Swiss-Prot record:
Pfam families: CARD
Coiled-coil spans in chain: 117-277, 332-419
Gene, per the UniProt record: CARD9
SUPFAM superfamilies hit by this protein: DEATH domain (SSF47986)
Domain CARD residues, every copy: 6-98
Effect of residue 35 to E: Abolished homooligomerization and formation of BCL10-nucleating filaments
Post-translational modification: Phosphorylated at Thr-231 by PRKCD downstream of C-type lectin receptors activation: phosphorylation promotes interaction with BCL10, followed by activation of NF-kappa-B and MAP kinase p38 pathways. Phosphorylated at Thr-531 and Thr-533 by CK2 following interaction with VHL, leading to inhibit the ability to activate NF-kappa-B. Ubiquitinated at Lys-125 via 'Lys-27'-linked ubiquitin by TRIM62 downstream of C-type lectin receptors activation; leading to CARD9 activation, followed by activation of NF-kappa-B and MAP kinase p38 pathways. Deubiquitinated at Lys-125 by USP15, inhibiting CARD9.
Description of how activity is regulated: Maintained in an autoinhibited state via homodimerization in which the CARD domain forms an extensive interaction with the adjacent linker and coiled-coil regions. Activation downstream of C-type lectin receptors, by phosphorylation by PRKCD and/or ubiquitination by TRIM62, triggers disruption of the CARD domain-coiled coil interface, CARD9 homooligomerization and BCL10 recruitment, followed by activation of NF-kappa-B and MAP kinase p38 pathways. Zinc-binding inhibits activation by stabilizing the CARD ground-state conformation and restricting its capacity to form BCL10-nucleating filaments.
Organism of provenance: Homo sapiens
Name of the protein in question: Caspase recruitment domain-containing protein 9
Free-text comment about domains: The linker region, also named autoinhibitory interface, is required to prevent constitutive activation and maintain CARD9 in an autoinhibitory state. Disruption of this region triggers polymerization and activation, leading to formation of BCL10-nucleating filaments.
UniProt GO molecular function: CARD domain binding; identical protein binding; metal ion binding; protein homodimerization activity; signaling adaptor activity
Length: 536
């Protein structure tokens, strides 16, 4: 087993790998083999495994190495054989040789029966570990299935939430589009109202211009009439003007009067010398009296003519005022007629605008009513779609719950079946193993690794159980039968058929129970709705 004859030299070689050994080795695995090799007594084993001072695994391994080092070369060989059995890679690293699994130390110490007992103990431990792992795998498988069901439920809820979000976004987009359309319609209505107001203002301005032109025309007609009357007056005055013959006669009379005045002046100058005569005095007195009378008559005539001129002026002024008043009255009549026509036109326009306003209000109310009906129908349809979606989700949840219950039942049945198979295999494997089972631990380790690989790859947990059972059948072909004498395939088929029948019956019972519960819930819901409506 070792090329070193000196004990110190052997253990000095192992001291070079002490760090690696303490970090890799588990003392609880190699102590049974060392105890069978009689290099480790129960007290030492209890000290290594149960000492409260040795809590860390590395310290336990260090104490174990120190105890084995006290046994010398025998402990060194037993330790290497334990490494060869349980840690072949570490054995190859320490010794540089491939593990041969000769087990000379345990054979020399306890014989082949001790080796067989050790291997049987290890096999039982591994079988128990395999059972624990299979139970753990089945529970993990059930937990994974439950998680898948929960994941499907979560995805369903997420899809529903996403659908509700999409519906909400679609509704918001529709609302935004309706708002934009309403805003566009309002803008168009405002533009049309502005255009209509501008057209009305232009129409009013044109009407005012027409009225001003009419007024200007009437003023021009009045001015024309006044000028015509003045022209007629001037023509009448020109017609009443004295003629040339009358003017010539008046000029002759004037000349005669001037000549007479000159004669009188001459006679007056000649008679200045005879002023003292009474006749001349009488004449002068008469002349003065006549002159005074003439002056008075002239003054009277002048005053009468002045009064006449003033009366004529007043008459003319009154006539002009009368004509002016007549013209103003005519203008006022025409203005009143114009304003009356304008007011009538405005009233007609207001009546037309009121009719158009009533029509627009009626159209708007009708459109609002149609929009309200459309919104009510849309809300009713959305409510119906939401109720149908909720019903579909509830049905889907019921389906998922049924699947989860079925999976749980399958898991329980599988565990029961596994327990029955394990119990039957334990009963069948009560006889002693053959020597060819010496390589079983390594094969079981390979089987465990392959099972873990299958589980990590998404395989079914039934595969390692089937492989283990097939291996047991191949190793013990004469013990493969069950206590009833039936082959395992037929027994498995029978169990599967009974499980299928049980699952169908259970599913039918659950469906009937769910239908009854749903009918009772609907009856209770309709009853509560009726009571609510009656109470409202």
């Amino acid at each position: 087993m070792s090329d070193y004859e000196n004990d110190d030299e052997c253990w000095s070689v192992l001291e070079g790998f002490r760090v690696t050994l303490t970090s890799v080795i588990d003392p609880s695995r190699i102590t049974p083999y060392l105890r069978q090799c009689k290099v480790l007594n129960p007290d030492d084993e209890e000290q290594v495994l149960s000492d409260p001072n040795l809590v860390i695994r590395k310290r336990k391994v260090g104490v174990l190495l120190d105890i084995l080092q006290r046994t010398g070369h025998k402990g060194y060989v037993a330790f290497l054989e334990s490494l060869e059995l349980y840690y072949p890679q570490l054995y190859k690293k320490v010794t540089g040789k491939e593990p041969a699994r000769v087990f000379s130390m345990i054979i020399d110490a306890s014989g082949e029966s001790g080796l067989t007992q050790l291997l049987m103990t290890e096999v039982m431990k591994l079988q128990k570990k395999v059972q624990d792992l299979t139970a753990l795998l089945s529970s993990k498988d059930d937990f994974i299935k439950e998680l898948r069901v929960k994941d499907s439920l979560l995805r369903k809820h997420q899809e529903r939430v996403q659908r509700l979000k999409e519906e909400c976004e679609a509704g918001s987009r529709e609302l935004k589009r309706c708002k934009e359309e309403n805003y566009d319609l309002a803008m168009r209505l405002a533009h049309q109202s502005e255009e209509k107001g501008a057209a009305l203002m232009r129409n009013r301005d044109l009407q005012l211009e027409i009225d001003q032109l009419k007024h200007s025309l009437m003023k021009a007609e009045d001015d024309c009439k006044v000028e015509r009357k003045h022209t007629l007056k001037l023509r009448h005055a020109m017609e009443q003007r004295p003629s040339q013959e009358l003017l010539w006669e008046l000029q002759q009379e004037k000349a005669l009067l001037q000549a007479r005045v000159q004669e009188l002046e001459a006679s007056v100058q000649e008679g200045k010398l005879d002023r003292s005569s009474p006749y001349i005095q009488v004449l002068e007195e008469d002349w003065r009296q006549a002159l005074r009378d003439h002056q008075e008559q002239a003054n009277t005539i002048f005053s009468l003519r002045k009064d006449l001129r003033q009366g004529e002026a007043r008459r003319l002024r009154c006539m002009e005022e009368k004509e002016m008043f007549e013209l103003q009255c005519l203008a006022l009549r025409k203005d009143s007629k114009m304003y009356k026509d304008r007011i009538e036109a405005i009233l007609l326009q207001m009546e037309e605008v009121a009719i158009e306003r009533d029509q627009a209000i009626a159209t708007r109310e009708e459109l609002h009513a149609q929009h309200a009906r459309g919104l009510q129908e849309k809300d009713a349809l959305r409510k119906q779609v939401r109720e149908l979606g909720e019903k579909a989700d509830e049905l889907q949840l019921q389906v998922f719950q049924c699947e989860a219950q079925l999976l749980a039942v399958e898991g329980r049945l599988r565990r029961q079946q596994l327990e029955t198979l394990v119990l039957s295999s334990d009963l069948e494997d009560g006889s002693p193993r053959r020597s060819q089972e010496l390589s079983l631990p390594q094969d079981l380790e390979d089987t465990q690794l392959s099972d873990k690989g299958c589980l990590a790859g998404g395989g079914s947990p039934k595969q390692p159980f089937a492989a283990l059972h097939q291996e047991q059948v191949l190793r013990n072909p004469h013990d493969a039968g069950l206590s009833s004498g039936e082959p395992p395939e037929k027994e498995r088929r029978r169990l599967k058929e009974s499980f299928e029948n049980y699952r169908r019956k259970r599913a039918l019972r659950k469906m009937q129970k769910g239908w009854r519960q749903g009918e009772e819930d609907r009856e209770n819901t309709t009853g509560s709705d009726n009571t609510d409506t009656e109470g409202s």
